[in-house]
């Protein structure tokens, strides 16, 4: 699982950088692949491409269930991490929901604010709970 964790972090770096610099995530991804320092793994590419492909729906789901936290008011790290976690829950059939949630929470503990892990856990757990209705 360590390889997947690294891939999630790498995908987070790409999405965060794109968000902060106002660039297209796929352009940032291509740049990172070309520089390959550190290398961008296959799963990181899959995650970024998946988030980009489904971003409108992912953002709609996050906006609906994040209650009083509009996406643009969330810390950028949390926003990127929640997009990754939501993509894994809704679209990555090979990732169990509990793994997607716990990985996102652990990365939030490492990289975000003190409040973020609880917020990420609650929101992604709710999305996982409603997965069947959200995927329809």
UniProtKB/Swiss-Prot annotation:
Function in brief: Involved in transcription antitermination. Required for transcription of ribosomal RNA (rRNA) genes. Binds specifically to the boxA antiterminator sequence of the ribosomal RNA (rrn) operons.
GO molecular function: RNA binding
Gene3D superfamilies membership: NusB-like
Keyword Repressor among record annotations: no
Natural source organism: Kineococcus radiotolerans (strain ATCC BAA-149 / DSM 14245 / SRS30216)
Keyword Transcription annotated: yes
Cross-referenced NCBIfam families: nusB
Entry GO terms, CC: cytosol
Cystine bridges: none
InterPro entries xrefs: NusB-like_sf, NusB_fam, NusB_RsmB_TIM44
Key words of the record: RNA-binding, Transcription, Transcription antitermination, Transcription regulation
Protein name, per record: Transcription antitermination protein NusB
SUPFAM superfamilies membership: NusB-like (SSF48013)
Transmembrane intervals: none
Family to which this protein belongs: Belongs to the NusB family.
UniProt-listed GO biological process terms: DNA-templated transcription termination; transcription antitermination
Pfam families per the UniProt record, alphabetical: NusB
Lineage start: Bacteria, Bacillati, Actinomycetota, Actinomycetes, Kineosporiales
């Amino acid at each position: 699982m360590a390889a997947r964790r690294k891939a999630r972090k790498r995908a987070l770096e790409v999405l965060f950088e794109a968000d902060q610099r106002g660039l297209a995530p796929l352009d940032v991804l291509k740049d990172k692949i070309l520089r390959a320092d550190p290398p961008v793994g296959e799963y990181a590419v899959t995650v970024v491409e998946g988030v980009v492909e489904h971003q409108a729906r992912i953002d709609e789901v996050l906006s609906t269930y994040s209650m009083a936290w509009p996406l643009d008011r969330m810390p950028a790290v949390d926003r990127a991490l929640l997009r990754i976690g939501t993509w894994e829950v809704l679209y990555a059939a090979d990732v169990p929901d509990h793994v997607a949630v716990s990985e996102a929470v652990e990365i939030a503990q490492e990289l975000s604010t003190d409040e973020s892990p609880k917020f990420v856990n609650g929101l992604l757990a709710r999305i996982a709970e409603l997965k069947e209705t959200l995927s329809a």
